[in-house]
Each structure stands twice: as structure tokens, then as C-alpha cells.
Amino acid sequence: MIGGDATVYTSRPSLGATMKSAEISGTNQLSAKLSKKVSTDDLKGKVTVTDADGKAVDVKSLKADGTKVIITADKDLDVRGKYTVEIKGFGSQNAIAGSVVRTDAFDRKYAYSGEDLGATFTKKQTGFKVWAPTAAKVELITYKSVDPNAEIDQTIDMTSESK
């Protein structure tokens, strides 16, 4: 067994260095956790970041702190996006929104102060509103009855609007 690895091996795995995880940790930062300590100098020329379309993301700076690597991008990252972080000798991991959602910058940009989230009912219609700034897709599912085993009636793709 390898810590953090759910794979069931049928032969002895290589216990080389690996990247355990990656996340969007700031508006223009990604963080990666490695299986062994590195220095910032060890990383020079070894880190690449690509977006969901495979396009390279320009890296402004790197900082290593033990087994944690902080990658600062040249521009803000899309919190709904998926990025791939690759570090030569450690492999790659997909990074999605992580600790970025607990930052002041995230709150300033995405906080919602309205009081109309959830279902808003009138005699003519029921409207549904959710706050999901990191979601790439949100679906509303309605059922044919209130029975817990009821069949799905409709699946409706919700649209993204400004706050």
C-alpha cells in the first residue's frame, strides 16, 4: 500500500517520488503536495501547468516549502476551470478549486448578499437560484411526485448569471 493511493497493486509498486495532490489555492496560485521534500532550485525548468484545453499557463514564480510547492501564475485562474500540474520526476495531478474558496479575494469577487437563494414560489411559477461560483455545471432535477422513490420528471441545465 502507498499512502494516499487507492490502487490495489498485484505486484510491488515503484516507490519513487510522486505528486499526491494539486489544487487552486489562490486567485493566481496552485499548490501541489509531493511525497518528498524539494527545494525551489530543484524545481527550475520542471514545472508545467496546462488548462482544460491543453494550453500552457504561464508560470510567474515557484516556491517550495518542504513537500508543498506553490506555483504562481502570470494571470488569474478560472475557479471553474480544471488545470493539470506536472512536475518532472513527480508526475501530474489535476487541480480544481480548493483553498481558494477560503480567501478574502474569492469572497470579494464571488460573495452573494442576496436573500433569494433556493426556491422562490409564486402562483405562476417557481424559480430556483443557487450560489455556486466554482461549479462548471448545475442541474435542477424534478420528480414526478413527492414519493421518495419517484421517477425523474425533468433534468434542467441551470444557467450562470452575474451575482
Per-segment meaning from a language model:
Residues E86-F90:
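Beta-strand-rich extracellular modules
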Residues K33-L43, W131-K137:
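Short proline/glycine-enriched turn/loop motifs at strand-loop junctions of beta-rich domains
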Residues G3-D5, T10-N28, Q93-A135:
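Non-catalytic, glycine-rich low-complexity segments
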Residues A73-K82:
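Surface-exposed, short loops/turns at beta-strand junctions within beta-sandwich domains
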Residues K129-K163:
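Aromatic- and glycine-rich beta-strand/loop motifs that create alpha-glucan
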Residues K63-A73, E161-K163:
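Aromatic sugar-binding surface patches on proteins
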Residues I24-S31, K63-G66:
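Residue-level recognition of beta-strand termini and adjacent short loop/turns
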